[in-house]
A protein has these predicted regions:
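Glycine-aromatic micro-motifs
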Residues: 6-145
Length: 145
């Protein structure tokens, strides 16, 4: 059950390549940026297979992941499900995040199944993720493998 925004859409918690504003504009036509936020008790990990590894947010007490919150439509959610290869590669569930204004909201997030090993991503994928970090005004070097 996904929580809906005031406009009737859903809140999507994004990290990785979905921080990239240009890609999100192409992927999710109705998406609107809401806020930067922190996903508490998670850490970023690359998982997958050699040359096909992607970022995921793994549980890790005491750590946090910088994320963006997007207001997305039902059509955007369908597009994201396809992009994230849900439910085969990633699971999707509700999670709480701490917004910049210290409010907490709940949105949906994708997390890769931990059956996939930690693995080095392709340079092109890493660059797309780094562009997203730069788009948000963050230091992209944290994404180096």
């Amino acid at each position: 059950m996904f929580l809906f925004s005031l406009g009737g859409n859903m809140y999507y918690i994004a990290y990785g390549s979905n921080l990239n504003k240009e890609e999100m504009k192409q992927r999710c036509k109705d998406a609107e940026f809401v806020s930067l936020a922190r996903l508490e008790n998670y850490t970023l990990t690359y998982r997958g297979n050699p040359g096909r590894a992607y970022l995921t947010a793994d549980k890790k007490k005491g750590d946090f992941v910088r994320v963006a919150v997007w207001d997305v439509s039902e059509n955007d959610k369908k597009s994201l499900d396809e992009y994230e290869d849900y439910p085969y590669l990633y699971d999707c569930f509700d999670e709480k995040v701490l917004l910049e204004n210290n409010e907490t909201i709940t949105g949906f997030i994708y997390q890769m199944y931990d059956r996939f090993p930690i693995c080095k991503p392709s340079d092109s994928y890493m660059e797309r993720c780094k562009q997203g970090y730069r788009d948000m005004g963050w230091d992209a070097s944290i994404l180096d493998f």
